[in-house]
Structure formats: C-alpha cells, structure tokens
C-alpha cells in the first residue's frame, strides 16, 4: 500500500500543559571561589516550546492547522512562548493567570553536559477549568481530532469533562497518559502509553500474547476504542477490540535522543486520524516519524518532507524532496565523492513534455541534478493571484517522480539567488532565451569557479499554453 505524508484535510486541537524550555550554553574552565561549583560563562541561549506546546509544534511541522489551549502566566515567558508558536502559524488560545507563572524549565549546559535545571512553576491543581472548558466546547467541532497532553501540571484536572465534550461531537480524543491512574482517561478514543507506563498499570508482561491480553482488558475496562503501546527498540503495538494485534517493528536506524518521541507519535497519530486515515495507516506513519525523531539531538519535530522521504525509502544523501539544511549536507557528501552538481530552478506549475525534456538534458550535464521550486507564495507574486494551479506539495511530488531529478528544494523568495549562493553548484542551468550573465546566481557560481549554461525549451511547450487550452475547453 502507498502511504502519503500529505494531510490536506486534517485540523488538530491540542489542550494540555504548555511549557517554555530555555537553554543556556557556555564554557566552563574554573571552579567558583564562592562554592565548589563550576562557573559557566554563558555564550548563547535557545528557547523551545515544551509539553503540549511541543505537541502543537510537531503538528505544525506537518503543515497542518493546529490550535493550542492551555494555562500560562501573564509574564515574559508567556510572550516568548507565544512568539515561538505563532512563528509556526499555531493558533494560541491561552488562559492567562495573574496568580501563576508560565511553566518554564531553564537548563544550563557546558561541553554537551547539563549542569543544572531550574524549574519556574506552580501547578494548576487549584485553578478552575471553566474557561478552558468553554473554549474547548466552542472550538472542538471545527477540528478532526483532539489531543489532551498531560504532564501532570494540573491543566487537565477536569479531563473527564474534556473527553465528554469531544465525544459528544464524535471527535477522536488521543491521550499520552501520565502516572498510573488510567481510569481518569475513561472513554477516550486512544491512549499511547510506553511499555513501562503500560506495565505499571497492568503488571509485568512476558510475551506478545500477554501484552495483547492485558491491553484488550484495559480497553474494555476503560471503554477505549484503541490502545497503542510504544515499546522502544521493539517498535509499537496497536490493540483494538475484535481485531488482531497490529505490531510494527522500530523504524529507527540510529538512536541519538528519545526526548519528545512520544510527542511526535501522538501528533502524527492524531493528524492522520483527523485526515481520515485508518488506525493501521496512522500507526505506520507515527512509527516512521518516531524513527526519524530519535535520530536527532534534543526535542525535535518531523517535517512532511522528512516523513515523505522516509516512507519512500529515500535517505538524506540519496534523493528526493529536501529541506535546505539536508540539501547542503547531501551536496557536501556528493562533492566529496567527486560528483558534479547541476542546479536549475522554476515554478513547474503544470509539468509538460518541455519540462521533462529540459530536466533530462540538464541531468546529462552532471552527476546530480538539484531542482529549486518556487513556493506557492513566490509563484503568486511572480505570476499573479490565479497561480499556481497546483500547490507546492503537488508540484514537488510530480517532479520527484522523474528519474532525472535527484534533489528537490523549495524557496520562498522571488528568486533563488540566496539559495544558489548557499549551494554553489558546479553548473547552473536555465532554460529559455537568457544570456548567461542574465541568469540569477550566475555571478556567485562563476566566482566559485563554476559554469553557467542556457538550454532551449521545446517549441510550443509552456504552462501558459496548457492553461489556455483548458480555458478554451471550458468555453
């Protein structure tokens, strides 16, 4: 079966314990004269979304609309967190309190070691959920799935009411449980405990059969629709009443850091279910995503590009749709192998024989062909409000199917000049009636010792002509 990482129908609502993670990095080479502790000279800092906010970031990285509900203080940390989230187009709908700080965790690191963590928090157990419940009731019917993200900080004190609000409108509720009191999650659609959390509730399991038996009993006891047990290096197991256990082996090639892997799993699960996928497909995609994220350092997200490439068996240095950072790494490896890198760019709105022939000819000029593709906003600025006809994901998916294309990357500017200057191909190619010196990026390539070449398009082949023919047929 052919799976896809394009979630065009999905919209996800997240409610839970939101946090701000702060990191201070510095050098340490002496002990304080005041106490037997190292002195850290802070050189840089970083801020990341944590808790339920990291779940929302994972969903946003899949190009899916997401709304986040939670509790924060009225403080600088809340503003910093909102800025991080809104930069990723996440709709923040926080209940802000004068009485509590925004949950913030400050980590001080030196030489890749965490020396100290400072927590700024006060749990929300004594806070009424009335405002959150009102917001949830107002919003939930507009979304395809609800994630309740529980880190035990008190935001989900009224978790039963939250579950019932969503179930009334037939919205699936997914929860990554906290603690051993799973009864508080009764009637949720799906729980995603890891193996240790699962065994803490049902007891030690000595076989696959025992996991299935105890899991199905838990589903019955809690009136769940499904249970997904994540099992580290053993993969994950989906259990549903009247269905055989669905086991997926781990997709991880190398494990650097499991931080945030649970957030990635539940995010992809909810997104896939909100998009109308089956439980089995949702679990497959979540398993692939988990295999990607544990290969990264720190709390990370998985992009649509990475997920699509992993589904189709593409490696970072192999071929396919890439993010700019991945492309740079792939080009560096290819150049180290002595391969000649060819680069071209365009909108490629409606792929026609002229495009195919041009790309085949460009590929023959070297060992690897990079195609830089204008984003939808970039095309709109260049071609007008009616363009593009096909969105970026569609255009790149079609181009990725051509054997002549090795790597695809998107750019949002009007021209790819910055991208070309970063990549510095051995040969820059453009189709049309240009003079080499007129081609964007030619100066940068020449200064680096590269070449610039103009190729001809086939006569009569153009996207504009294709659009005109379609319009004539409509008339």
Swiss-Prot record:
<feature type="active site">
    <location>
        <position position="263"/>
    </location>
</feature>
<comment type="subunit">
    <text>Homodimer.</text>
</comment>
<dbReference type="InterPro" id="IPR029056">
    <property type="entry name" value="Ribokinase-like"/>
</dbReference>
<dbReference type="InterPro" id="IPR011914">
    <property type="entry name" value="RfaE_dom_II"/>
</dbReference>
<comment type="pathway">
    <text>Nucleotide-sugar biosynthesis; ADP-L-glycero-beta-D-manno-heptose biosynthesis; ADP-L-glycero-beta-D-manno-heptose from D-glycero-beta-D-manno-heptose 7-phosphate: step 1/4.</text>
</comment>
<feature type="region of interest" description="Cytidylyltransferase">
    <location>
        <begin position="343"/>
        <end position="475"/>
    </location>
</feature>
<dbReference type="InterPro" id="IPR011611">
    <property type="entry name" value="PfkB_dom"/>
</dbReference>
<dbReference type="GO" id="GO:0033785">
    <property type="term" value="F:heptose 7-phosphate kinase activity"/>
</dbReference>
<protein>
    <recommendedName>
        <fullName>Bifunctional protein HldE</fullName>
        <ecNumber>2.7.1.167</ecNumber>
        <ecNumber>2.7.7.70</ecNumber>
    </recommendedName>
</protein>
<feature type="binding site">
    <location>
        <begin position="194"/>
        <end position="197"/>
    </location>
    <ligand>
        <name>ATP</name>
    </ligand>
</feature>
<keyword id="KW-0119">Carbohydrate metabolism</keyword>
<dbReference type="GO" id="GO:0005524">
    <property type="term" value="F:ATP binding"/>
</dbReference>
<dbReference type="Pfam" id="PF00294">
    <property type="entry name" value="PfkB"/>
</dbReference>
<dbReference type="GO" id="GO:0097171">
    <property type="term" value="P:ADP-L-glycero-beta-D-manno-heptose biosynthetic process"/>
</dbReference>
<comment type="similarity">
    <text>In the N-terminal section; belongs to the carbohydrate kinase PfkB family.</text>
</comment>
<keyword id="KW-0547">Nucleotide-binding</keyword>
<feature type="region of interest" description="Ribokinase">
    <location>
        <begin position="1"/>
        <end position="317"/>
    </location>
</feature>
<comment type="pathway">
    <text>Nucleotide-sugar biosynthesis; ADP-L-glycero-beta-D-manno-heptose biosynthesis; ADP-L-glycero-beta-D-manno-heptose from D-glycero-beta-D-manno-heptose 7-phosphate: step 3/4.</text>
</comment>
<keyword id="KW-0067">ATP-binding</keyword>
<keyword id="KW-0548">Nucleotidyltransferase</keyword>
<dbReference type="GO" id="GO:0005829">
    <property type="term" value="C:cytosol"/>
</dbReference>
<dbReference type="GO" id="GO:0016773">
    <property type="term" value="F:phosphotransferase activity, alcohol group as acceptor"/>
</dbReference>
<dbReference type="Pfam" id="PF01467">
    <property type="entry name" value="CTP_transf_like"/>
</dbReference>
<dbReference type="InterPro" id="IPR004821">
    <property type="entry name" value="Cyt_trans-like"/>
</dbReference>
<dbReference type="InterPro" id="IPR023030">
    <property type="entry name" value="Bifunc_HldE"/>
</dbReference>
<dbReference type="GO" id="GO:0033786">
    <property type="term" value="F:heptose-1-phosphate adenylyltransferase activity"/>
</dbReference>
<comment type="function">
    <text>Catalyzes the ADP transfer from ATP to D-glycero-beta-D-manno-heptose 1-phosphate, yielding ADP-D-glycero-beta-D-manno-heptose.</text>
</comment>
<dbReference type="InterPro" id="IPR011913">
    <property type="entry name" value="RfaE_dom_I"/>
</dbReference>
<keyword id="KW-0511">Multifunctional enzyme</keyword>
<dbReference type="InterPro" id="IPR014729">
    <property type="entry name" value="Rossmann-like_a/b/a_fold"/>
</dbReference>
<keyword id="KW-0808">Transferase</keyword>
<keyword id="KW-0418">Kinase</keyword>
<comment type="similarity">
    <text>In the C-terminal section; belongs to the cytidylyltransferase family.</text>
</comment>
